[in-house]
Amino acid sequence: MPSTDQDDQLRELIPRLRRFALWLTRDAHAADDLVQSALERALSRWSSRRDDASLRSWLFTILYRRFLDGKRSAKRYAWLLGRLQEPDEPHWPSAEREFTARATLEAFGRLSDEQRSLLLLVAVEGFSYREVADLLDVPIGTVMSRLSRARQALRQLSDGEIPVPSLRLMKK
């Protein structure tokens, strides 16, 4: 079982796990179930956890693999983008920004699960390429090429509404 310090770290990671699960499942109830399932798996396998492993990476790996397992076994994963929720802000600064944001969200929703997961892990959750490679159990070069293809697909799906960056930033 986790120590008090690890228990605190675990509690701090729950909102991030839920956010990632929500993007994967596109359903709040399914996301909660997925997080609960991942935490149950983590706690039941706590003694087999390597001490030098990052708790964050370990939990995200478990969550992602539980998602894939559930998807395979259920054979009925269907996501709906149908309606975009209104932002919490009362209004956007410009119509152009709102249009770009909606186009990006719609395009993001049409990406494959693999592409969406990669973009979420790197761009939203802040994982390094190395951490994502370890999490998905693939070489770092594979992560980089898949991420590049995911970004290109996102630009294509948004009908050119997402600008191509002139300078590419590389993460360590």
Regions found by a protein language model. Give the residues of each.
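A short, charge-rich alpha-helical start-of-domain segment used by transcription regulators
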Residues: 1-19, 29-32, 43
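C-terminal edge and immediately downstream basic/flexible tail or linker adjoining helix-turn-helix-like DNA-binding
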Residues: 2-6, 134-135, 152-172
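Short, aromatic/basic-enriched loop-to-helix "N-cap" motif that marks the start
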Residues: 15, 45-61, 140
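Helix-turn-helix DNA-binding motif, specifically the short coil turn and the N-cap/start of the second
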Residues: 27, 128, 137-142
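Internal acidic/polar
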Residues: 77-106, 128, 168-171
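A short pre-motif secondary-structure segment
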Residues: 118-122
